[in-house]
Amino acid sequence: MSSANRVTTPDTSVLIPVYNVERYVGACLDSLLAQDFTNFEALVINDGSTDGSRAILEQYASRDKRIRIIDKPNSGYGISMNRGLAEARGTYIAILESDDVMAQGALRLLYETACEHNAEVVKGNFWLWWSGNEDTAERAELFHVVPDSLIGKVVTPTVNGLDIFYQKPSIWSALYRADFLRQERIQFLETPGASYQDAGFNFKVWASAQRAVFIDEPLLKYRQDNETSSVRSPGKVFCVMDEHAEMRRWLEARPGDHRMLLKVLGRMKFNNYLWNYDRLSDELRTTFLERACPDLAADRDEGLLDEQIMGPVKFTELQCLLTSPERFRRVREKLPQDASGGLASVRQILAYGGIGALWHVLTERLGGRR
């Protein structure tokens, strides 16, 4: 079928949210149109861009009728993505951020894997990517978001794949069956000014999926040198808290006993709160902790911050934060956050909790409870 003809019954709908990305969107669309899998539609949701993005989109749409531009007033990522979900006609849905680049053959690999395993979700890895300029060379680092224990398997995440809940959301290195998303009412948070909505979407997918397939291949280049990325924004201090409130609202609106998933969500919340804390300025860190600490304390009092689910290091960090935020801040400033291994864990437990915390962990393990 010629790529110049509008796909009437696409196998896959690719959602591409666009806002002021004139520097990057051309490379993004080129990578999609170069795929050897051709039966797709590209829904490009223009969120009221004020730069030259719209003109670039028109050029591409005039050359390839698989590209459909959806214009809307600027109202944020969540509303844009939900608009795309509502208008998608494909059996499956992929997400491609407008500053990223899809790997060759990625769309075919995702689609064929989904069909082979009758999967609701297919998830793969990706590259961290710096495109380079006149002063720096292009480089890419492979990022393994899929745990080794899940590669090549068909998994029900809530039963035999809990590790995936704690990985970087990366909703764009995946393929989702459209009727699965609609049946489970999986959408994005639409609150004006919201951010990091990928975390909530990611949680809802893993909490709902009965058949998720995980592959080792990297599926796209995730741009790291876009200075306007929301991850780099020092503002939006409390957006991560809003996103977690939405995850809990969605979960508790579903039938069934959610105690275990609420504990999983508790660990996710603490991890995401630490990530948010680390990216903020000193002044904003204080402001954030003034709200985050009571929120975490409420979860602790509900029994949702479970030591066995969180692990000894994170649980000791949590106890330090809730007991003495000032000590937590001093320790976190001194300790390297990228250290790993048994010795690093011992150092972290000692730094945050002292010898008493380390003794507790050792006696728990020697007693066979861990």
Question: Where in the sequence are the language-model features?
Answer:
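Donor-binding/catalytic cores of nucleotide-activated saccharide
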Residues: 77, 98-216, 220-237
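A conserved acidic beta->alpha catalytic loop
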Residues: 31, 46-55, 73-75
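Glycine-rich, basic loop-to-helix element that forms the pyrophosphate-binding segment
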Residues: 72-88, 101
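N-proximal low-complexity "stem/linker" segments adjacent to membrane-targeting elements
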Residues: 1-33
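Cell-envelope/extracellular polymer assembly enzymes that use nucleotide-activated donors
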Residues: 10-13, 41, 200
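Short beta-strand/loop segment that forms part of the nucleotide-sugar
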Residues: 39-48, 68-73, 97-98
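Short aromatic/hydrophobic "clamp" motif used to bind/position activated sugar donors
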Residues: 93
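Membrane-interface aromatic/basic loop that binds lipid-linked glycans or pyrophosphate carriers
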Residues: 119, 279-370
